[in-house]
UniProtKB/Swiss-Prot annotation:
One of its GO terms (biological process) is intracellular phosphate ion homeostasis. InterPro entries: P_transport_PhoU, PhoU-like_sf, PhoU_dom. It comes from Mycoplasma genitalium (strain ATCC 33530 / DSM 19775 / NCTC 10195 / G37). It comes from the Bacteria. Pfam families: PhoU. This is Uncharacterized protein MG409.
Length: 225
């Protein structure tokens, strides 16, 4: 009976992980689409990309609800062991992190849409920052699927990325600040909106860190004591 229950739990785990990684891919795709938007100079194509990202945000919400419901159902029907329960809870927590990461794609898109009348070149430095966060997101995805490399390596990388990104975005914002007309209200407002958008990008790295940390905890619950 114990072996049967273990097999059921492993099947449930496999199903949950499949849903989780499908959702993760969707979030990456949303940010890849955002990256295209930041680089696209054709106005009509930009409008199409904006519409696509908003639709992807709606799909993100549905995917998150589906994953959480499946996780709750797994807990209620299978009476999971401690290790299985830790994985299920981690998937729930990480799905919330992924939903927030997708939210940031949505929020950044709103920022770009609001300034659609401006030359796309004004977002050049934002492209660099976002590409950095997108690369970190992809590395996080790959590290969770790579059973050969220890997760501690990506945890160290995620920690390093957060520190490096702070230095990077300060340089970018300083450059923007030096180029604006301080007496022009619209330019000051743009800078404020830009700072908020940069912080959205920064949070992507924070949530990548959270996801790696959560999955590390499954393998070694004592690691952060």
């Amino acid at each position: 009976m114990e072996n049967i229950n273990y097999q059921i739990l492993k099947r449930s785990e496999k199903k949950l992980l499949k849903l989780f990684f499908e959702y993760f891919k969707h979030v990456i795709n949303a940010h890849e689409t955002l990256n295209q938007l930041l680089c696209e100079d054709n106005l009509e194509k930009r409008k199409e990309l904006i519409k696509t990202i908003y639709e992807m945000e709606d799909q993100s919400n549905r995917s998150e609800f589906k994953l959480i419901n499946e996780s709750i159902w797994t807990i209620s029907k299978n009476s999971p062991l401690a290790s299985h329960l830790r994985l299920t809870i981690t998937i729930i927590m990480s799905s919330r992190d992924l939903e927030r990461i997708c939210d940031y794609a949505n929020n950044l898109t709103k920022f770009i849409e609001h300034y659609l009348h401006l030359d796309i070149k004004i977002f050049n430095n934002l492209v660099t920052l976002h590409q950095s966060a997108l690369n970190n997101l992809k590395k996080t995805f790959e590290s969770l699927q790579d059973k050969e490399k220890p997760l501690t390596l990506q945890f160290e990388n995620a920690t390093k990325t957060i520190i490096e990104f702070e230095h990077q975005y300060r340089l970018v914002l300083t450059k923007y600040y030096e180029t604006i007309n301080k007496n022009e209200v619209t330019e000051r407002i743009f800078l404020i909106d830009l700072v908020a958008s940069v912080k959205h990008i920064e949070r992507i790295n924070d949530y990548c860190y959270n996801i790696i940390k959560s999955f590390l905890f499954i393998k070694n619950p004592e690691i952060f004591n």
